[in-house]
Amino acid sequence: GLACGALLKEAGVIDHWKFAHPKDLQDGLVEVNEDDCLANVPYVEGCGLWFDHHSSEHERLELAGKYKGESRTAPSCARIIYEYYGGKERFPQFDDMMEAVDKVDSGHLTIDEVMNPKGWILIGFLMDPRTGLGRWREFTISNYQLMEKLIDACRTMTTAEILALPDVKERIEVYNEQTEKFKQMVSQYT
């Protein structure tokens, strides 16, 4: 969601956004119209643009020719948006982010990248809802608010600058506190 949002904003496609759970979209709990651009979530009839990288959506809905945008198998939805709007020529500042997003989303990470994440991979882990950091409620701002803030940060700041933001640093602290427990669990059960 974060990389897709940063790319879409940089391309001038969006000026506001909402992060929604895929099931909420499928169940019709989120209103969608022709002004909406959906990314990395299931297709909803009536949206203006749709980008996805999950082949299951085409199989489920037989969508060929029914939408504007692009959907195909790729390492990440961000990769599809990146290429759709011009790739490296349009987004030269996003090379490192794109490499990390593709790795994190597709799971093509080395053991060292999982055990000792740095840079964009660490940012990806911190912002992925599956990491579970959202259940710690003592953060200054919510994970949702941080996601909103980071859409612009990803476009204008280096990874070092992003990782130094107070709202990110407090999440790194919690993440690192949990690292030893994680390492013990991985070594015990793999």
Segments predicted by a language model, with ranges:
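Hydrophobic helix-and-loop "lid/oligomerization" segment in the mid-to-C-terminal part
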Residues: L2-A3, K9, I14, L109-T190
